[in-house]
């Protein structure tokens, strides 16, 4: 009986006139059920010991009758269908939007619906989402429950919810407007903040490096100039802190950092600029200024010293620094004079 049933249905389908749309629909439904084995009695028991994979399907109605003006299909699909793809990946299910209004071209949808083909039979049903799961029984029902809970969020007719806002941002990003996307904007702002914070840090590094020639301030006659070097350390750090005040009159060879861009708009290459300038200004600018271009740091230190107080550093001029080598022989000769008295006979 079953062997003859399918050929009879196919012959009856071919004999029907295309104008009998309802008859063709019923015949196609019967053929589809027979091919899928749905005509057989369904199993009433689930064997959880064997844990065999089972197929679970559920149709979720889309409330287009209650909210006819809301585009539920667009919200479910998202930009380029990415929202529905991510929803399937998260829930580990297969989802399909079927029924009336599931196709964008209404004329083609009506044509396919009247064609009577089995794969387009769903166009006669109401608009719905078909959720299918193929997994062990416990996992299949767990996935189905998760999918029903997640898809419920997409069936709320709200234009300003989090899902809609995320889709608009993604659509802007896909259309080439990366400056309005979330990730580039956050990175661009972070780089602007680091620029404003690290500028004094760079000057501190310069002050710390230029504090090497502190021996210039060693007064005459001090027997232990090394102790003075340690006491002059905090003064050098103070100079580094006051260097931003001296930037109004930049010394020769000084190259000020470029001004940061405005935060209102972000250009096309803001993503690259965010990381490139952040590392250049924070990490390597101080080393380049102090080691690769020592003349810049020396000039900065020299101008600051003379601009702060010339009278205080008159006794520590360049002549004393160049003639500091003669201090040691003069001190030795003085010590030798004291030693000549007990050993004068030799």
From Swiss-Prot:
Sample GO molecular function, one term: identical protein binding
Ranges for region Involved in homodimerization: 1-160
SUPFAM superfamilies listed in its UniProt record: Eukaryotic type KH-domain (KH-domain type I)
PTM annotation, UniProt: Phosphorylated on tyrosine residues by PTK6.
Tissue: Highly expressed in testis and brain. In adult cerebellum expressed predominantly in internal granular layer interneurons and in hippocampus is exclusively expressed in CA neurons; expression is restricted to neuronal subpopulations largely non-overlapping with expression of KHDRBS2/SLM-1.
KH domain sequence ranges: 61-127
Comment text on domains: The proline-rich site binds the SH3 domain of the p85 subunit of PI3-kinase.
Record-stated family: Belongs to the KHDRBS family.
Protein name (record): KH domain-containing, RNA-binding, signal transduction-associated protein 3
């Amino acid at each position: 009986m079953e062997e003859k049933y399918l050929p009879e249905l196919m012959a009856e389908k071919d004999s029907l006139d295309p104008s009998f749309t309802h008859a063709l629909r019923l015949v196609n439904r019967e053929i589809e059920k027979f091919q899928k084995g749905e005509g057989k009695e369904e199993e009433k028991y689930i064997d959880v010991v064997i844990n065999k994979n089972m197929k679970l399907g559920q149709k979720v109605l889309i409330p287009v009758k209650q909210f006819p003006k809301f585009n539920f299909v667009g919200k479910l699909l998202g930009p380029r269908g990415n929202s529905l793809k991510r929803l399937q990946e998260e829930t580990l299910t297969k989802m399909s939007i079927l029924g009336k209004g599931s196709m964008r071209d209404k004329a083609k949808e009506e044509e396919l619906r009247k064609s009577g083909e089995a794969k387009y039979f769903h166009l006669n049903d109401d608009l719905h989402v078909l959720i299918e799961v193929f997994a062990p029984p416990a996992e299949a029902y767990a996935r189905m429950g998760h999918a029903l809970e997640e898809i419920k969020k997409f069936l709320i007719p709200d234009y300003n919810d989090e899902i809609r806002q995320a889709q608009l941002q993604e659509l802007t990003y896909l259309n080439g407007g990366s400056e309005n996307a979330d990730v580039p904007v956050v990175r661009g702002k972070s780089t602007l903040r680091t620029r404003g914070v690290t500028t004094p840090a760079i000057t501190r590094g310069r002050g710390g490096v230029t504090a090497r020639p502190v021996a210039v301030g060693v007064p005459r006659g001090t027997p232990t100039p090394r102790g003075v070097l340690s006491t002059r350390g905090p003064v050098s750090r103070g100079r580094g802190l006051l260097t931003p005040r001296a930037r109004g009159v930049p010394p020769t060879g000084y190259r000020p950092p470029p001004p940061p861009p405005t935060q209102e708009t972000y250009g096309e290459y803001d993503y690259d600029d965010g990381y490139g300038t952040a590392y250049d200004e924070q990490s390597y600018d101080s080393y380049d200024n102090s080691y690769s271009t020592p003349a810049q740091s020396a000039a900065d230190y020299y101008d600051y010293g003379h601009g702060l107080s010339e009278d205080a550093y008159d006794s520590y001029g360049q002549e004393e620094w160049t003639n500091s080598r003669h201090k040691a022989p003069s001190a030795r000769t003085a010590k030798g004079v004291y030693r000549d008295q007990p050993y004068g006979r030799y």
